[in-house]
Regions:
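Bacterial N-terminal signal peptides that target proteins for export
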Residues: 1-10
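C-terminal motif of bacterial Sec signal peptides marking the signal peptidase cleavage site
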Residues: 18-21
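Ser/Thr/Pro- and often Gln-rich low-complexity regulatory segments
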Residues: 23-118, 122, 189-239
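Surface-exposed beta-loop interaction hotspot
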Residues: 105-151
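Surface-exposed beta-strand edges and their flanking turn/coil or helix-capping segments
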Residues: 126, 136-139, 162, 173-175, ...
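Short helix-loop boundary/capping segments
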Residues: 132-190
Length: 239
């Protein structure tokens, strides 16, 4: 495995782990909790190079880091009308999860939760992946790098990571950049830490907002989508 691929794999693993870290792995039952004290913890994440989107839904007692809950009838959760089954893991506790094809996921979706009193809470969101237009050339010369996107807001924010294949260099890692009118500019001076050769380029957009239709305890919706590219960086040709 090259350093580029190794570093990329580590960064993705760390990013995904951070989505679920610092939470309790204890498991309880929703029947033992006041319905108004249930916290909704919703996560949707996908990558361009993965064929599926993952929808992960958790219900907790004691806020975002509290005890995870198993839904007892008549409580249930549906995603776009399809009921989810409970699963569990040592790290995260109880959760409700499904995968959907990325190719057909663009657009509006609804998460429908029913509590023990049969009260329904519908949480709607829209999933819009972004793309590079046009794609990145195989070779880029040093200088200000300009990238153009579709699928972003007029002013949007992306997490940007650039890594090279040299173990001696200091990478540009996890910078946050503003994209204006679909245009991202990475200034030439920021490339000084990278050596010439293969460059791994990762871009992620994250949306993190409070639940709009939840209990008194509230909740959080986190949506994450990313893409990766590789190109060769070389010195600008002298005129």
């Amino acid at each position: 495995m090259t350093r580029t691929n190794f570093t990329a794999s580590i960064l993705v693993s760390i990013s995904l782990l951070s989505l679920f870290s610092c939470t309790s792995n204890e498991i309880g039952n929703i029947k033992d909790v006041n319905p108004d004290a249930v916290f909704f913890d919703y996560t949707v994440f996908a990558d361009e190079d993965n064929s599926d989107v993952t929808v992960n839904l958790q219900y907790r007692m004691g806020g975002k880091n509290g005890t995870s809950l198993v839904l007892d009838e008549p409580s249930k959760v549906l995603f776009d009308g399809e009921q989810l089954k409970v699963d569990s893991a040592k790290v995260t506790g109880a959760f409700y999860e499904m995968q959907k094809p990325l190719a057909a996921f663009t657009g509006k979706h609804v998460i429908s939760f029913t509590d023990l009193n049969k009260k329904e809470y519908n949480e709607e969101f829209e999933f819009t992946p972004f793309t590079l237009e046009p794609n990145i050339p195989a070779v880029l010369e040093r200088g200000d790098l300009v990238f153009t996107f579709s699928g972003l807001e007029s002013v949007d924010v992306l997490s940007v990571t650039l890594t090279d294949t040299s173990f001696q260099s200091a990478d540009i890692m996890n910078d946050t950049d503003t994209v204006r009118n679909g245009r991202l500019v990475i200034a030439a001076h920021r490339l000084s830490a990278l050596v010439n050769g293969p460059i791994n380029f990762q871009l992620y957009k994250e949306v993190d907002r409070p639940i709009k239709n939840g209990t008194k305890e509230g909740g959080n919706l986190h949506i994450r989508y990313g893409l990766k590219r590789q190109f060769e960086l070389q010195d600008a040709k002298k005129l």
